[in-house]
């Protein structure tokens, strides 16, 4: 009886009890995750305390009515209560047959700890006396005391501290350490004091009518949906589109009724390792919150075998039933009341990456799930964990966290602090592990960034230079850490009250953004045999190819090892920073006043480029390599510093005089360089630049072919906005190809295509496709130009936009499907109309983001290209879209 996807259900209250349920596991949207699973457990015959669920739709109606109960709902709740009373042979508010209730929230998506719970509802003076006659004074008044505290805090908004003060004062007066040491008389006195707290805090007495308690508790759960912490959690976890929370009203069962009672929490498999063995904790003579609050140290679940063998045996069987039923590892809460087992909750258990892969593979091998179902059991984030080093024990360093920035590139790094790229390279060459700390990074820092174990920056967002480069290399990076102040001159960094000097140890958690003092122990990436098995299943299912962005032979090899099927983006400019000789030659080319002098500088660069391409072609033997011609504005290749320093360095490196150097710098200076003299505009203005790069590519390709390497070069022209721009560059490249083929006596196949990163190019894609054999969407620049956001400055306002709901996601991290995605669709359709066999892919940062990859797969792209370390994640996302 799953609800229709549209419209509203007339039924708003659903009963459940052993063997009887009005709901099922498919009704999460209506009953919330907890309510749907309680109904399911009851319907398959497990011992679930009976109760009823008030639907998420009722919560939505309550919010829409300005926080007023919808007409008729209270009568339906009372009908539900009567059903539970008849089932249990007890009644709410009856001292002779007392029924106590728990009232819990439960949205369609698990939001642990985000909503409010009330236990032991239904107690007042008369019911407590009746309960004491049945179960003893201590139990009755301890339950009453807990209820007054919880109800006061959750429902009446009385600070928990006011109750805690009374409890601590009594323990101090009696010379006691633990709550459990209080006598029944002490607890009765506490009940009296807690009631006074209501009068003092609210000016009214505690509501002793149990039905009024129930009504107020239901309203409190509805209200908690809009509490600041719940809204914040939904925002952080990008949870949208839910109706509200359901309310689960359930008969209380007690684990604190002596040594034949207890409570526990377990996972049906180990959530850290995936081992097929129950993993959990158990407390004798305790209520559920005692485990959660850590008041007493729980015992390992195995201890339950000895003290409650029958209940343990039933629990093991229930776990088997639930795993077989849900076909997933389960997280279970249970209580034993006087030797009788009760199942309180089950949900899919959260797990580590290592555990997720092992459980998926094991369940297929056990015949529990099919391979396609197993592919859905592993989240992209799980693979991310497996591919980066992690801290051995993150909880151990919590008191050493001195700042938190943006988690720009996952993993963990430990090293000695250095402040310049040069120092990072020097120290690294001496075998030292370093953390490069910069105010912000620039392309000139890439050598030091590559040498560093991790990168920490004061400024810059999740898509800043540091973040993008670090992710590409699988390096840990924490960016935009506003709590730090970097002083390059003195080589110190101030972090909060700490001052760290060069050489001091620092640890970074790129998955959380934490900056940690000292040298924390690391464990290497856990690449197990199960991962290889799992990824082979992934590759059998997916249709979308996954390529990698790689600029060096080392990157290309890493990409291939991670399952890349080619190189979708090789950025030639990164090669120019690889050595001093190269960057000097680039600067001579920039400073050259004549074509002849510029050609001389390019001739010096040619062998470097050719050798790099040979290395990449060799690493990618048998696979395609897409090489992007020079893209960034030329000023990025100039030295850093003030104008005088730049002029001095250029003069010494290139032999130019000061006047010429200054004039050249002024000419290269741009108001908006990202929209300025870059991309194909450089190749058109300086055709010899395109000629040199094309020649290096073709000469390298033929040299490798002569060595028996299979080479498939694809040349990509960047920042094209008109078909004429592309036509100019295509003609030039073909001329160079013919010259090289003639001089080397050999011909090879190659393709020429373009980046689609200017909105106009997407709109005239049909005309551009007449010249281009492939399109590759540069979604970083396409997003920048479509939104009109500067990628380097969005950090100033994106957090505000996300907090206020103006944007749901940072568009540089998650593709904006409605706007930028529409341009991708349009360009793909128009391009293929003009050239039906047009190869279409994407090489922006979005190529490794799971929801974006799913969109590209649905849109009919041939491939995505992402950083080498995100290749397995993109492979998984491409498969998950089809299962």
Curated annotation (Swiss-Prot):
Q: What class of enzyme is it?
A: transferase
Q: Which InterPro entries does the entry link to?
A: ATP_grasp_subdomain_1 (IPR013815), PEP-util_enz_mobile_dom (IPR008279), PEP_util_AS (IPR018274), PEP_util_C (IPR000121), PEP_util_CS (IPR023151), Phosphohistidine_dom_sf (IPR036637), PPDK_AMP/ATP-bd (IPR002192), Pyruvate_phosphate_dikinase (IPR010121)
Could you state a single Gene Ontology molecular function term?
metal ion binding
Subcellular localization(s) per the UniProt record: Cytoplasm
Major subcellular site? cytoplasm
Could you tell me which residues belong to the region Disordered? 1-21
Q: Which cofactor does it need?
A: Mg(2+)
GO biological process, alphabetically ordered: photosynthesis
Residues the record marks as active site: 465 (tele-phosphohistidine intermediate), 843 (proton donor)
Q: Which PROSITE patterns match?
A: PEP_ENZYMES_2 (PS00742), PEP_ENZYMES_PHOS_SITE (PS00370)
- What does the record give as the reaction this protein catalyses? pyruvate + phosphate + ATP = phosphoenolpyruvate + AMP + diphosphate + H(+)
Q: What is its EC number?
A: 2.7.9.1
Tissue and organ distribution:
Expressed in leaves, roots and stems.
Instruction: Cite the Pfam families for this sequence.
Output: PEP-utilizers, PEP-utilizers_C, PPDK_N
GO cellular component terms attached to this protein's record: cytoplasm
Q: Which family does it belong to?
A: Belongs to the PEP-utilizing enzyme family.
Q: Which NCBIfam families match?
A: PRK05878.1, pyru_phos_dikin
What is the purpose of this protein? Formation of phosphoenolpyruvate, which is the primary acceptor of CO(2) in C4 and some Crassulacean acid metabolism plants.
- Name of the protein described by the UniProt record: Pyruvate, phosphate dikinase 2
Classification from the root reads:
Eukaryota, Viridiplantae, Streptophyta, Embryophyta, Tracheophyta
Identify the gene encoding this protein.
PPDK2
């Amino acid at each position: 009886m799953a609800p229709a996807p549209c419209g509203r259900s007339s039924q708003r209250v659903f009963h459940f009890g052993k063997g009887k349920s009005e709901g099922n596991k498919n009704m999460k949207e209506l009953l919330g995750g907890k309510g749907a699973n309680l109904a399911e457990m009851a319907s398959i015959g497990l011992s679930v305390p009976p109760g009823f669920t008030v639907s998420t739709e009722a919560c939505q109606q309550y919010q829409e009515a300005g926080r007023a109960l919808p007409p008729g709902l209270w009568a339906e709740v009372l009908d539900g209560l009567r059903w539970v009373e008849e089932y249990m042979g007890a009644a709410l508010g009856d001292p002779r047959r007392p029924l106590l209730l728990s009232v819990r929230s439960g949205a369609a998506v698990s939001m642990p700890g985000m909503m409010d719970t009330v236990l032991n509802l239904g107690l007042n003076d008369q019911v407590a006396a009746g309960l004491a006659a049945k179960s003893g004074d201590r139990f009755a008044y301890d339950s009453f005391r807990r209820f007054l505290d919880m109800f006061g805090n959750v429902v009446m908004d009385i600070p928990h501290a006011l109750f805690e003060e009374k409890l601590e004062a009594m323990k101090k007066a009696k010379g006691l350490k633990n709550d459990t040491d209080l006598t029944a008389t002490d607890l009765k006195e506490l009940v009296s004091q807690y009631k006074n707290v209501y009068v003092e805090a609210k000016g009214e007495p505690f509501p002793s009518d149990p039905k009024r308690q129930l009504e107020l508790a239901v309203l409190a759960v509805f209200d908690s949906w809009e509490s600041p912490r719940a809204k914040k959690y939904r925002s952080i976890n990008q949870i949208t589109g839910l109706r509200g929370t359901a309310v689960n009203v359930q008969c209380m069962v007690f684990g604190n009724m002596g040594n034949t009672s207890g409570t526990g929490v377990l996972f049906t498999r180990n959530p850290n390792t995936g081992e097929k063995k129950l993993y959990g904790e158990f407390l004798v003579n305790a209520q559920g919150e005692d485990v959660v609050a850590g008041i007493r140290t729980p015992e390992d679940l195995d201890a339950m075998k000895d003290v409650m063998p029958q209940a343990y045996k039933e629990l093991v069987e229930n776990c088997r039933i639930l795993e077989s039923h849900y076909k997933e590892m389960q997280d279970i809460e249970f209580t034993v009341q006087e030797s009788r087992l009760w199942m309180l909750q089950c949900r899919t258990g959260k797990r580590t990456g290592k555990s997720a892969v092992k459980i998926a593979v094991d369940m297929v091998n056990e015949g529990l799930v099919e391979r396609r179902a197993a592919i859905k059991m592993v989240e992209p984030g799980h693979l991310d964990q497996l591919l980066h080093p992690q801290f051995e024990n993150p909880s151990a360093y919590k008191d050493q966290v001195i700042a938190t920035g943006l988690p720009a590139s996952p993993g963990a790094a430990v090293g000695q602090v250095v402040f310049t790229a040069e120092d990072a390279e020097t120290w690294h060459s001496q075998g030292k592990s370093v953390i490069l700390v910069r105010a912000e990074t620039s392309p000139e820092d890439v050598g030091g960034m590559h040498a560093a174990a991790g990168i920490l920056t004061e400024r810059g967002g999740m898509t800043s230079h540091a973040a993008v480069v670090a992710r590409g290399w699988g390096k840990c990076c924490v960016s935009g850490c506003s709590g730090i102040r970097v002083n390059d001159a003195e080589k110190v960094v101030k972090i909060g009250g700490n001052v760290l000097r060069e050489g001091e140890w620092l640890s970074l958690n790129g998955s959380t953004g934490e900056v940690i003092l000292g040298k924390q122990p690391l464990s290497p990436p856990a690449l197990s045999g199960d991962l290889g098995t799992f990824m082979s299943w992934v590759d059998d299912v997916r249709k979308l190819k996954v390529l990698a962005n790689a600029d060096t032979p080392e990157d290309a090899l890493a990409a291939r090892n991670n399952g890349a099927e080619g190189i979708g983006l090789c950025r030639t400019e990164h090669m120019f920073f690889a050595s001093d000789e190269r960057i000097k030659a680039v600067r001579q080319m920039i400073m050259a006043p004549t074509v002849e002098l510029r050609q001389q500088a390019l001739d010096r660069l040619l062998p470097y480029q050719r050798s790099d391409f040979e290395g990449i072609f060799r690493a990618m033997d048998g696979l395609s390599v897409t090489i992007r011609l020079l893209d960034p504005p030329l000023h990025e290749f100039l030295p850093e510093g003030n104008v005088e320093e730049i002029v001095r360095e250029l003069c010494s490196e290139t032999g130019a005089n000061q006047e010429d150097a200054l004039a050249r710098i002024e000419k290269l200076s741009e108001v908006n360089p990202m929209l300025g003299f870059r991309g194909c505009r450089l190749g058109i203005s300086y055709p010899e630049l395109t000629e040199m790069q094309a020649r290096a590519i073709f000469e390298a390709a033929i040299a490798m072919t002569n060595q028996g390497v299979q080479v498939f070069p694809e040349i990509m022209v960047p920042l094209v906005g008109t078909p004429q721009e592309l036509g100019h560059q295509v003609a030039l490249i073909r001329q160079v190809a013919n010259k090289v083929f003639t001089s080397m006596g050999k011909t090879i196949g190659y393709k020429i295509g373009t980046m689609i990163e200017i909105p106009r190019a997407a709109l005239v894609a049909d005309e551009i496709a007449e010249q281009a054999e492939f399109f590759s969407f540069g979604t970083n620049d396409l997003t920048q130009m479509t939104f009109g956001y500067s990628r380097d400055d969005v950090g100033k306002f994106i957090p505000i936009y996300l907090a206020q709901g103006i944007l749901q996601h940072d568009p540089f991290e998650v593709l904006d499907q409605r706007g930028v995605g529409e341009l991708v669709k349009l360009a793909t359709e128009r391009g293929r109309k003009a050239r039906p066999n047009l190869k279409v892919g994407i090489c922006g940062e979005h190529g490794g983001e799971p929801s974006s990859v799913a969109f590209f797969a649905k849109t009919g792209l041939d491939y995505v290209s992402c950083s080498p370390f995100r290749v397995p994640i993109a492979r998984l996302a491409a498969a998950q879209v089809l299962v």
